[in-house]
Amino acid sequence: MDRIIEKLDHGWWVVSHEQKLWLPKGELPYGEAANFDLVGQRALQIGEWQGEPVWLIQQQRRHDMGSVRQVIDLDVGLFQLAGRGVQLAEFYRSHKYCGYCGHEMYPSKTEWAMLCSHCRERYYPQIAPCIIVAIRRDDSILLAQHTRHRNGVHTVLAGFVEVGETLEQAVAREVMEESGIKVKNLRYVTSQPWPFPQSLMTAFMAEYDSGDIVIDPKELLEANWYRYDDLPLLPPPGTVARRLIEDTVAMCRAEYE
């Protein structure tokens, strides 16, 4: 699937190593390979954006290596492709040897997979399913400040799905563990690949059922009900959390204005 990049090759360039992304001038490189000193590198086409190929090159650059978070303001489709590249680069880097027999592996020519040359085991990129949920109580939404976000941003609750658990069960468990309340009338909204490092966010809306807020201090700094027209600092646009909050606000406006 990969090939050597030639002088006239062009497109978007995802140059990644150890979950970092090359961002010269703070931007995702776009243009001819020669302009970025990429001729002769091995590259894998991982998609297209607006008719232009998106290439993945697994390489460490001396300067301008940053986080994929820095390009979160890109168009959603291009951000997702950049995230795909970072995740694939880390997958190939971390699967050089078979976890069963220890022998060297090689990339498949037909799909994103690594194959063992000895025991024939096949490995695919790992995806960690997560739930994220906006909880409404009359004209208010439950928002929390997470311990990992000490920048004042308040957001909705989220967490990883556990082994042997449905998405619906994960919502109920995470909400109870983090906030101490029960929810009802769960409704699926959308999903979003989230490369931090390899999550797939499944987004829901729910209604408050019962209970008082009792936070898990290992997860949350604080949580509270906020009226739809008096909200704290929110996650940036383009995130699924922001969409859930805005959808909830729209529902409240329609009902209370």
Curated annotation (Swiss-Prot):
Q: Provide the residue positions that the database annotates as binding a divalent metal cation 1.
A: A158, E178, E219
Mind telling me which CDD domains this protein's record contains?
NUDIX_NADH_pyrophosphatase_Nudt13
| Bilayer-crossing regions | none
Entry keyword annotation includes Magnesium: yes
The residues the entry assigns to the signal sequence are none
How is the cofactor bound, as the UniProt entry phrases it?
A: Divalent metal cations. Mg(2+) or Mn(2+). Binds 1 zinc ion per subunit.
Q: Biological process GO terms, please? A: NAD catabolic process; NADH metabolic process; NADP catabolic process
User: Mind listing the UniProt keywords for this protein, alphabetically?
Assistant: Hydrolase, Magnesium, Manganese, Metal-binding, NAD, Zinc
Q: Report one GO cellular component.
A: cytosol
Q: Which family does it belong to?
A: Belongs to the Nudix hydrolase family. NudC subfamily.
Q: How does it assemble?
A: Homodimer.
Role according to the record: mRNA decapping enzyme that specifically removes the nicotinamide adenine dinucleotide (NAD) cap from a subset of mRNAs by hydrolyzing the diphosphate linkage to produce nicotinamide mononucleotide (NMN) and 5' monophosphate mRNA. The NAD-cap is present at the 5'-end of some mRNAs and stabilizes RNA against 5'-processing. Has preference for mRNAs with a 5'-end purine. Catalyzes the hydrolysis of a broad range of dinucleotide pyrophosphates.
Q: Per its UniProt record, what HAMAP family does this chain match?
A: Nudix_NudC (MF_00297)
Protein name in the entry: NAD-capped RNA hydrolase NudC
Q: Which gene encodes it?
A: nudC
